[in-house]
Amino acid sequence: MTHTETTVKLFFAAVCASAIAVTARAQPAPYHHYRTLNTQHFRITVPDGLEREGRVAGAAAEHAYEQLARELATPRGVIDLVVTDDADYSNGYATTVPSNRIVVFATPPVDAGSLRLNEDWLGIVITHELTHIFHLDRTRGVWSLAQHVFGRAPALFPNSYGPSWLTEGIAVYYESRLTDGGRLKDSESRMIARAAALEHRLPALNALSLGSPVFPGGISAYGYGSLFVDYLARTRGDSSIRRFIDAQSATVVPWAIDRDARNGFGIGFGAAYDAFRDSIQRSVGTLTPPLPGWRELTTHGYFAVDPRFTSDSTLVYASADGRSTAAEYALSLDGTRHRIGRRNALGPSVPYLGGLLFAQPDRVSPSEVRSDLYVERDGVQRRLTHGLRLVQPDARRDGTIVAVQLAPTRSSLLVLDPTRREYRLLRSAAADETWSEPRWSPDGSAIAVSHRTHGGMFSLEVIDVASGVATVLDRGAFIITSPSWSPDGK
């Protein structure tokens, strides 16, 4: 056997092995009846009942394709786009294996703060995932020849060898540049970076990963990655991103991306990131308390969210510390805390008839994740609803509950009486309309709620429960969220 034959056989074995080791992803439920819609560049597949959402997604995808085609080399062939409603969270993913395909969950982002700044959230998700296709499908040189022989094996896409901060950073950059929203237009990533700079803890480039155990976890790949890519585009020119992607797609050693960076941006990633990090460090001053008399009650770091007072001296909050599962904690004002119970996701827990009321997602089948209401008393959790798709509950003193009900591309308001097992629709929603974060007034006569309508207009409204009449307190093309009442009902 010649050396060349041995090399070819070893390479073929590596390709076959990589095809087996593809990362598993959530798949749409196989038992739905599906319909297919066709556009110029997409084959759109939707389950029965989501035909409207499929048409909207098709139009958004063609618009995103047209815009991205002005920036990057176009991908090969027709792209499969699946719109599904199998999970009660807003998400999507893209893959180039075995063909170019995108899956988008139709649930609107009522919980994801960084995705709420938009005129069309479905357009943002599709633009983000389609950028992955434009980026990762790009294959030239020896890689193109290898795919011609072996097919679309995972190991034969050179751009897929890049780190997650690069892949997600490029996608967030284009989602923000080519739409009216996007995470670069939101303040969250910049706040995280500036907070780290204030403590002189800006992460190293090799620490930016979807699997990072350090705050902010996998968000670092999106946040820092997009800020860095945006910095490169501003300092090296918009066209430098295409030059880099083209260089990366033909490189023989795909993980040696610093050479491709010099070809595309005129500077290696290491040197560029040092300059980027220095620019953030120079933009911040000194760390000062946000308010006079400010005192930090938690020091464990990572995520501590959704605090709710249960008495004058105690509050509860949801936490994920990076070392254990998400959980609810009770915290006294002297800093003493204890763990109440685990949670499947972070979210508010509110006082409810001697216990705590909360919503959490769980699998109802191998392919479906649904959110329902639970109550916890004395360490025992009991499920209150089944299949109602409820999030963000709040409870009145008599036990009446208001919660957000999720549906494809919209969310509504429900009022529930669990003792009678009755519920009524307080506010319905049209497509691309959401009601979120309802809060009872102290006297239980009204509900404050955030309302988003089509086109990205937000309003803060107070609904009189008896009459159903709403008073609009504020309205505008900016995010209005997290309403709360003062003890005197204001």
Labelled PLM ranges:
Residues G293-T298, T336-G341, V380-T385, E422-S428, ...:
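A short beta-strand motif characteristic of beta-propeller blades
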Residues P28-P30, P98-S99, S114-V125, I133, ...:
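Acidic/His/Gly-enriched intrinsically disordered linker/tail segments
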Residues D306-T314, P348-G355, Q392-T400, E437-A446, ...:
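Blade-terminus and WD-like Trp-Asp/Gly-His loop motifs, strongest in beta-propeller folds
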Residues A26-P163, G211-V214:
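Juxtacatalytic substrate-recognition/specificity segment
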Residues L184, H300-A304, A318-E328, G341-L346, ...:
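A flexible loop/linker signature enriched in serine peptidases of the S9 family
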Residues S332-G335, E376-V380, D417-R421, D464-G468:
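Short loop/turn segments that connect beta-strands within beta-propeller blades
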Residues A21-T23:
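N-terminal signal peptide c-region/cleavage motif recognized by signal peptidases
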Residues Q27-N38, P216-I219, F244-L353, A359-D362, ...:
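Beta/coil-rich, acidic/histidine-enriched accessory regions frequently appended to metallopeptidases
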